[in-house]
Amino acid sequence: MSQVIRTLALTGLALAGLSGCVSVPRGQGGAAPAVVGQVSESAQQAETARQAWLQAHPAWSFQGRVAISKGRDGGSGRLDWQQDGPRYHVQLSAPVTRQSWVLTGDTTTGAGRLEGLDGGPRAGADAEQVLLEATGWTIPVNQMPDWVRALRIADAGAARVDLDEHGRPRTVQQDGWTIDFLEWTPASAAQPELPRRIEARNGDAKVRLLVDQWTLSP
């Protein structure tokens, strides 16, 4: 596997780790997950309000750093995600190799386009298939907008969700992955609380995401 494809594949693993490695249509999960945690009524109301606010503000972006490992392979890079409703524009960059790739697509249609690969861009009606052919990894990009914001967890096919004292997801178990929301960006006048540090693991695969900045349009 070339260095370009290997680095992109590892970054793809990071996205897959945060998403549970399964493509599930938005809002069409399986059985309801087991929700664990003693949460006050005020905390439940606050979390309901947080999720409602996020669903009412579909234009947002974040910049962060990702570190991943699987077996003997590992790597790190930067991730710049921009979302406008169902449309996304994601830039992946590896500072060590000074290489970057751009993924664009639409979560409604499922179509996507990947640029920055040897041989030119690749596009198709199924963004996940485009990525699979380019990297060898199945990456459920259509679920990422909800997962990185800890939004609609119950609809994403999770088997178990542990809540913290504020009613937010603390740990999510899905399809062999354990995803921990370890740190949150405090709420401000412009936006509610959002995940800052997320770690995911599945066997010898480990993923760490640190969000440096969230930006949400009013």
UniProtKB/Swiss-Prot annotation:
Q: Where is the signal peptide?
A: 1-20
Q: Where in or outside the cell is it found?
A: Cell outer membrane
Q: Which GO terms describe its cellular component?
A: cell outer membrane
Which superkingdom, per the lineage? Bacteria
Q: Which UniProt keywords apply?
A: Cell outer membrane, Chaperone, Lipoprotein, Membrane, Palmitate, Protein transport, Signal, Transport
Provide a GO biological process annotation. protein transport
The protein's topology relative to the membrane is: Lipid-anchor
Residues carrying the lipid (N-palmitoyl cysteine) are C21
Residues bearing a lipid moiety (S-diacylglycerol cysteine)? C21
Determine if Transmembrane helix is one of this entry's keywords.
Answer: no
Kindly give the CDD domains that the UniProt entry links to this protein: LolB (cd16326)
Described purpose of this protein according to its UniProt entry:
Plays a critical role in the incorporation of lipoproteins in the outer membrane after they are released by the LolA protein.
Protein family (similarity comment): Belongs to the LolB family.
Q: How does it assemble?
A: Monomer.
**Protein name in UniProt:** Outer-membrane lipoprotein LolB
- Which species is the source of this protein? Xanthomonas campestris pv. campestris (strain ATCC 33913 / DSM 3586 / NCPPB 528 / LMG 568 / P 25)
